[in-house]
Amino acid sequence: MTRAEKEWEVYSGKYRTYIKTERGLAANTVEAYMRDLRRFRRFVTERYRLSPLEVETPVVEEFLNSLFEAGAEKSTQNRTLSGVSSFYDFLLRTDVLEKSPAE
């Protein structure tokens, strides 16, 4: 497992715990957020081999564009962006990052 993959595992696991316990989201909502985050993670690691801490705004924009080009509904695009933004907001709140690439 690469360093980037390890960081994705660590931070996505912490994020899952956060949205499940501290935010108290319903199980279906947690699963939807995690599914969207896995989709984003797959895009980032397959194309760029980046850890979540190395992602910059153009990568997020390219990911959203890929959803559009794949014919994803606008509601799917918005929900996915919301999930990715929530993940990066979590990293900001926990002082892991200073700036979100999903702003």
In which residue ranges do the predicted regions lie?
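N-terminal leader/domain-start detector
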Residues: M1-W8
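N-terminal core-binding DNA-recognition domain of tyrosine recombinases/integrases
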Residues: T2, G13-N28, M34-E103
